[in-house]
Amino acid sequence: MKRARGFTLLEVLVALAIFAMVAASVLSASARSLQNASRLEDKTLAMWIADNRLNELQLEQTPPSSGRNQGELEFAGRRWEWRTQVDSTAEQDMRRVIVWVAAKPLGRERGSIEERAAARLVGFLGSQP
């Protein structure tokens, strides 16, 4: 009797099990990579917005007064919220500015902009001589 050549059912099942485990780990790694890329994009765009906001305050004719201010804008096809806090410093002509930027929530996300912020930028503004 001639022996048939090929794989047994057990060998095929073991190979499929190994392939399934490898495929699951590859899919999991690629999903994490996509999440990280999305988070990095959010942080980059938010930092650009915060930097722009700080530059806008620097270009104003009069230095900003102490207190909080907030607003919304569209940037890169998305809605964003920003909040600035201006504080006086020991130096009379110097102001400390904190800018928070967060993506506008789509649903019922809770929390302040400070808690949801993708970027937080601290800078100092001085009056022009």
Curated annotation (Swiss-Prot):
Give compartment(s).
Cell inner membrane
Q: Can you give the propeptide residue ranges? A: 1-6
- Grouped into one coarse class, the protein's main location is membrane
In the bilayer, the protein is annotated as: Single-pass membrane protein
- Where, per the database record, does this protein carry N-methylphenylalanine? 7
Q: Name one Pfam family in it.
A: T2SSI
GO annotation, biological process: protein secretion by the type II secretion system
Question: What SUPFAM superfamilies does the database record attribute to this sequence?
Answer: Pili subunits
Any one GO cellular component localisation term in the record:
plasma membrane
Keywords from UniProt, A to Z, are:
Cell inner membrane, Cell membrane, Membrane, Methylation, Protein transport, Transmembrane, Transmembrane helix, Transport
- Could you describe the post-translational modifications of this protein? Cleaved by prepilin peptidase. Methylated by prepilin peptidase at the amino group of the N-terminal phenylalanine once the leader sequence is cleaved by prepilin peptidase.
The record lists the membrane-crossing segments as 7-27
Q: Which Gene3D superfamilies has this protein been placed in?
A: GSPII I/J protein-like
Inactivation phenotype: Deletion mutant results in a non-functional T2SS system.
Q: Does the keyword Chaperone apply?
A: no
Q: Which NCBIfam families match?
A: gspI (TIGR01707), IV_pilin_GFxxxE (TIGR02532)
Q: How does it assemble?
A: Type II secretion is composed of four main components: the outer membrane complex, the inner membrane complex, the cytoplasmic secretion ATPase and the periplasm-spanning pseudopilus. Forms the tip of the type II pseudopilus by interacting with XcpU, XcpW and XcpX. Interacts with core component XcpT.
Indicate the family of this protein. Answer: Belongs to the GSP I family.
What does the record give as the function of this protein? Component of the type II secretion system required for the energy-dependent secretion of extracellular factors such as proteases and toxins from the periplasm. Part of the pseudopilus tip complex that is critical for the recognition and binding of secretion substrates. Type II pseudopilus confers increased bacterial adhesive capabilities.
Know the name of this protein? Type II secretion system protein I
Species this protein is from: Pseudomonas aeruginosa (strain ATCC 15692 / DSM 22644 / CIP 104116 / JCM 14847 / LMG 12228 / 1C / PRS 101 / PAO1)
Please name the gene that encodes this protein. xcpV
